[in-house]
């Protein structure tokens, strides 16, 4: 399995979310709403999730091994860093569609 495309939108938010990504796997399958989060130990990737009635977040889609998780995280963060903080980037308000 290879990440064959990454689309990234930076977001303006008071929280720790910095961007939302969509990835394509093997030119055949797309996963939307992957978040780039600025955590206590640096940036990390959070898979799409849904809040349960008891307030807990559950992943909707996620890799089942650390190697695949690493490939996804590397691809998304490489694109995030490649884009940099250029003023030419369009920022999107968090929650706006």
Swiss-Prot record:
One of its GO terms (biological process) is division septum assembly. It comes from the Bacteria. Coiled coil: none annotated. Keywords: Cell cycle, Cell division, Septation, Sporulation. Disulfide bonds: none annotated. Belongs to the SpoVG family. PANTHER family: SEPTATION PROTEIN SPOVG-RELATED (PTHR38429:SF1). Essential for sporulation. Interferes with or is a negative regulator of the pathway leading to asymmetric septation. This is Putative septation protein SpoVG. It comes from Bacillus velezensis (strain DSM 23117 / BGSC 10A6 / LMG 26770 / FZB42). The gene is spoVG.
